Amino acid sequence: MRRLRAGAFAAALLIGNAALAHEGATGIVKQRMDEMERVGRVVKRINERLKSTRGLADIARDAEEVQAVAARIPSLFPPGSRDGHSEARPAVWERRPEFEAASRALVEESGKLAAAARSGEEPAIAAQFRSVTQACNGCHDAFRARERR
């Protein structure tokens, strides 16, 4: 349960600071910020569903939404797309294979979450949700700059 709260906290931070970070962003930078905010909202929704144990059947659809965005992540970071609004570290472009591997990890883990959700087994869903949030955090730790305040 502690890890579920940590995942929800991470999602809340992502959503809470998104409005400030998006101010002035345009083009691909705004698009990727919007997509990351979308993932944050979906992760938060999954966490809420797990806490209430209602809507567990909907988690598969939520996980598939995360998976679809995760599959597009590398294309949202083309060369030369770092500007003053971007929260991306230069490592995104300097360590591209590692960045793409982190994206693939989120695709894989969110796919496993969808499968776990279809099983209806709450413990399996919760365990796999933790793996999804770990994939998110792993990428953010390596490739996302700290929140601007």
Language-model segment annotations:
Residues 23-131, 149:
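Extracytoplasmic c-type cytochrome modules immediately beyond a signal peptide or single-pass transmembrane anchor
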Residues 132-143:
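The canonical Cys-X-X-Cys-His
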